Amino acid sequence: MSNSKKTKILLSEIDLFKCIKRISFEIIEKNLSVTDVILVGVETRGVFLAKRISETVRDITNKNILVGNLDPKLWRDDLENYHIKQAKNSIIPSDIKDKNVIIVDDVLYTGRTIRAAMQALLNFGRPKKIQLAVLVDRGHRELPIRPDYIGKNIPTEYEQKV
């Protein structure tokens, strides 16, 4: 009997582009002045996504959104399940006081990574507002976390990997 896992592509390149564009337009609509917005990508795929969203917003509005990165590993409540050698440096490109900070991640699942990211972010100051943007929301929340911007809802089974 084979233990091979089936792989299924959930988003094509075109789907990914559409999701990023939709999230970008929603950010522009919900934030009257995008100059007060800072995108903070969760290491590592969230950083890539935050950069793509920033580029798309710039293409639409001719305004730059600062992008930072955040490694929330040390703030996780399940550290015993991870073999963390060293956390990456978090870089927040500006003072976050009175800014709308949007945490960006690729997949939202239990909510634990986002909870840790919020805790890590608050070490840099107190933003005016924290919002959440995710490419994929797969459900199965263990914490009361809800994204403000979603590229695509993809219900999964608890055991599946995305």
Which residues does each PLM region occupy?
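PRPP-associated nucleotide enzymes
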Residues: 1-162
